[in-house]
Swiss-Prot record:
Residues 119-210 bind DNA. It comes from the Eukaryota. It comes from Drosophila melanogaster (Fruit fly). Keywords: Developmental protein, DNA-binding, Nucleus, Pair-rule protein, Transcription, Transcription regulation. It is found in: Nucleus. Residues 31-81, 94-120 are annotated as: Disordered. This is Fork head domain transcription factor slp1. Residues 61-80 have a biased composition (Polar residues). GO terms for molecular function: DNA-binding transcription factor activity, RNA polymerase II-specific; RNA polymerase II cis-regulatory region sequence-specific DNA binding; RNA polymerase II transcription regulatory region sequence-specific DNA binding.
């Protein structure tokens, strides 16, 4: 019994081992058959020939780019960019030459300008305003008169009646070359007149630019310095350290400099009042001096100097002429 059990055990173990082997060998082709069906996909990685073919396919230019191929592509793209830039430059130069040739050809230019009568005139709005005022018989125009002049002379303003009128109004109010004067009571109509300021005598319209230009910019500064010297010199001469002041019918009072400064700053009456009080404080102990005039009387300068100062002040626009 014991022997039979041992034989049974030994037979069972051998049979079990021998039984597993044929089962594995039998089932192995079944497991490899589906892999064999996908042999075309997995074949490059299954043998050495396949690996060589895969590496050759990877190195071929039809696959993804390598560092060498990317560098070559970037170099070729840079060369193409340079060629494009050079081509654009040559194209721009050619267009510039064509434009210059068209501008230099009078026949083409005349045809272009003749076909467009409503072209904007080559003048600034300030130049157009000055042109309108200078061409008027009385050297003055209202705002509507300026509009009418521009509409009658330039077809552009007749065809386009919006936008440019606001620009005319803004330039009239901002430019110092134009001065507004009130209309007299016996003059029928509406609106104030616009005239050219006396300081605009040296202003002209540029032929090439179409804008206002000044003949001699340094001349106005020279006249301004002479004007200031003419105002301050006679009054500052009343100082005890200076030359004797000329007699204009008024005594030499110490507030002459303050009066001149007030006159230069648009005739400020407060400066006269302060100067008058200072003069009274200084002149109180000296009874033998002439009685100083009231500030109301000082607002009118001596007759010999009044007209000249008023004309100069009006010329430089320090206060309105009215």
């Amino acid at each position: 019994m014991v022997k039979s059990e041992m034989e049974f055990k030994s037979n069972f173990s051998i049979d079990a081992i021998l039984a597993k082997k044929p089962i594995n060998t039998a089932t192995q082709p079944i497991k490899t058959e589906p892999v064999h069906h996908h042999h075309q996909y997995v074949h490059p990685y299954s043998n050495s020939d396949g690996e060589l073919s895969a590496s050759e396919d990877f190195d071929s230019p039809s696959r993804t780019s390598t560092p060498m191929s990317s560098a070559a592509e970037s170099l070729s793209s840079q060369n193409n960019d340079k060629l494009d830039v050079e081509f654009d430059d040559e194209l721009e130069d050619q267009l510039d030459e064509d434009q210059e040739s068209e501008d230099g050809n009078p026949s083409k230019k005349q045809k272009m300008t003749a076909g467009s009568d409503t072209k904007k005139p080559p003048y600034s709005y300030n130049a157009l305003i000055m042109m309108a005022i200078q061409d008027s018989p009385e050297q003055r125009l209202t705002l509507n008169g300026i509009y009418q002049y521009l509409i009658n002379r330039f077809p552009y303003f007749k065809a386009n009646k919006r936008g440019w009128q606001n620009s005319i109004r803004h330039n009239l109010s901002l430019n110092k070359c134009f001065t507004k004067i009130p209309r007299s009571y016996d003059d029928p109509g509406k609106g104030n007149y616009w005239i050219l300021d006396p300081s605009a005598e040296e202003v002209f319209i540029g032929e090439t630019t179409g804008k206002l230009r000044r003949k001699n910019p340094g001349a106005s500064r020279t006249r301004l310095a002479a004007y200031r010297q003419a105002i301050f010199s006679p009054m500052m001469a009343a100082s005890p350290y200076g030359a004797p002041a000329p007699s204009y019918g008024y005594p030499a009072v110490p507030f002459a400099a303050a009066a001149a400064a007030a006159l230069y700053q648009r005739m400020n009456p407060a400066a006269y009042q302060a100067a008058y009080q200072q003069m009274q404080y200084q002149q109180a102990p000296q009874a033998h001096h002439h009685q100083a005039p009231h500030p109301a009387q000082m607002q009118g300068y001596p007759p010999q100097l009044n007209a000249e100062l008023f004309q100069r002040m009006q010329f430089f626009g320090k206060f309105p002429s009215s």
